[in-house]
């Protein structure tokens, strides 16, 4: 393919951002100090989750979750490097189950659609957030009906046993089984759910899972927990699990492996954490036995209403805010031993599929285009900056480093425009090597300031001696890394051409400066002027003994005539200190040539050559910061099926 824009110009611009002192700053620079020799505590990647809800009618959920559009979407979600997203929390999964028979005559279940969806997740190395939600062909209508309560327990037990047999207990025990989503919103479709019915339903879920294996975990209720007497079902469930009576065993108290709540930000980052603290304190006061029970916020979005178009959801504004929320939770909650509660998971509910006329502006990870002027019509997805940001977060490692932001002598916490998360990886053996990541955000929550830059001085010290120490910078802002911005510059085409898609995809990745030797003495000083909003990742690596491992699970997915998607796994690559993946193509399966593309560490690539020739074989390998290649993946053949000639369908967006 042709170069899409002068690479040298982009790198020169990034170099000027990082190396040149800001000209006439309007305010004192922010000083970011990081001590690589001062590890504080473990850094758990508690943010690696997303979710979505199939649209109405829920009885046809299979048509959405198994659609080609969603298959592409989940390929993108699973392609975040280093399992940067590992869970997809999904509503209405039991609408994928068909019930046969009737009460009194025996029931049987068809799990074909559910099998298909869970297989799709597993193919993309994703876990389900498994909400036990749906009426299974409308059979379940009333959980005060004791017969239905026993039948529900049997259904839950049957599906749990089925997937233990299909995937193994080691895999299924990682799933977060959860109650019906947001019970106090009463979105039960045709199911009657009283307080007693909801408690009966929960006990049936619990005992059904336990019958399959005690290793399976169950939590809930996944709701807002407004102050009592509001949210009666949520508080009632906690009361029941704390000291109520188990419907099946008659014992006092019912297991609750985690407490899930939903608090969103109303366009404020810090509001999410502040609300969580209030709810956690109420839970501790009312139910002291749950003081150590893990708490999830598995819908922790900056704003309610996934389909509500918002300009800031389209670009780096959203990406930087998501990083800011995560940094606030780590720095203000988990690292604060005096006020910490057992916070275990933060999920953004943003794996939906966008629709016309707002491909970028809805709460999604990808931008979806339904291209109806081809024969046949087809779908294209673009990676939004928020999904790219999950890849930057994936470069953080298991130990948090001491880091501090100050301005004019005043130390600033994470509830300010500039913040930082820093981590290190300690070698686990002779073949391993030390590395550190410093992720700096510039974010004013949902507000973008196109003409404003923030002067920053980053001082990193304490880097231990090591072989071949280098550093790499990756930078995102709306001027350089916004497919939405490129789409607007192109005139917002409804059906972009192949060339227009190439131009938008050229803005998907961060601008990366090639590896440079770390200065002597284990110290590094950078003086970037960060646009507001923006993200800057500084990655420092010692050279591992061996080059990267092999790329695996390479697949080729068709897009349209002359275009395809390549997806692969980095699970055996090992190193995080990767510069790019080299992709090679062969028309005859013998002589391979490299595909020209920008450096990228995302585990997915859209091949859309000018020639339109895509039939052949493909292979992929990783290249590290020292230009050492790993082994090629096993080759994957792709044969394009010719499309019958004829006029394109005009279609409608």
UniProtKB/Swiss-Prot annotation:
Keywords for the protein's UniProt record, in alphabetical order: Disease variant, Disulfide bond, Glycoprotein, Glycosidase, Hydrolase, Lysosome, Mucopolysaccharidosis, Signal
For this record, an example GO cellular component is: extracellular exosome
Primary localization: other
Name the reaction it catalyses.
Answer: Hydrolysis of unsulfated alpha-L-iduronosidic linkages in dermatan sulfate
- Give glycosylation sites per the record: 110, 190, 336, 372, 415, 451
Q: What is the effect of changing residue 300 to T?
A: In IDUA pseudodeficiency
Q: What is this protein called?
A: Alpha-L-iduronidase
Q: Give the source species.
A: Homo sapiens (Human)
**What lineage does the source organism belong to?**
Eukaryota, Metazoa, Chordata, Craniata, Vertebrata
